[in-house]
């Protein structure tokens, strides 16, 4: 597998949030693809830039009222299907 850029990692996290809203599930599914540190860093960045919001202690949602999901690059489609 090729090395993913930080932008690719954040896009992957956003699309994974569409599939798994619970933070615990999100970390579990992404841990096969990304290091936990990268998942946490990407999630913190997405929350800080208001592209993702936390709903209660466990639920994470894309903040589509604030910003649209970026287009999914071809190189991430297969990775996303596998998580």
Positions of PLM-derived features:
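Short amphipathic alpha-helical interface segments
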Residues: 2-30, 83
């Amino acid at each position: 597998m090729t090395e993913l850029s930080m932008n690719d990692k954040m896009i992957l996290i956003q699309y994974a949030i569409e599939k798994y809203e619970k933070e615990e599930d999100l970390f579990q599914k992404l841990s096969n693809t990304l290091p936990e540190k990268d998942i946490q860093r990407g999630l913190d960045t997405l929350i800080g830039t208001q592209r993702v919001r936390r709903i209660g202690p466990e639920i994470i949602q894309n903040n589509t009222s604030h910003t649209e999901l970026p287009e999914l690059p071809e190189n991430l489609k297969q990775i996303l299907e596998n998580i």
